[in-house]
Amino acid sequence: NQYLEHLGIVFYYGQDKVSLVKTDSIDMASKKSLKRHKYKVEGDVSVEMLTSCFEGDADDVEVTAMVHKFTGESSFRITVLPNNHGVRLRRCSDQELPRQCARVWVDGQDAGVWYLADSNPYKRWIEDEFEIPESLTRDKSVLNIRIVPESREEGCPVSWNESAYEVFCYME
């Protein structure tokens, strides 16, 4: 039996300040939440309950929630802190179908493309994120978001869906 001795040094480059602050959330199963956020969805819309699991360590824990699937677009209003340095929008969704892609608009300005390539028909819940730059969020307390699904490849169906959103502001 041979014993090995390991030495190491760990450097932590962190800040004592909070850098992300949660400012809002939208629950697709709550009519009150949808109304408060002025949530609208267009196109072919299907609303269904999904019971499945997330990938990862707790991949045997079932979660049940409502999912909005659509081919048109969705829009909603979120609350942010005016002195933010950008916003992170986190979506909870069903990843059964691959290549979920949508163009994101913030107050009528193009914020870029949100793309989720992965799929998992067995562990269907996933959370993914979209970063909204400070140039579109600074000095605002409310953002009007528009999500317009698009197809990544010719002949591929549009496959965007939403179960919940969480909003985080980058702060100094």
Model-predicted regions and their roles:
Residues 1-63, 162, 168-172:
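Activation corresponds to long, low-complexity, non-globular regions
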Residues 21, 56-84, 92-172:
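Beta-strand-rich ligand-recognition modules
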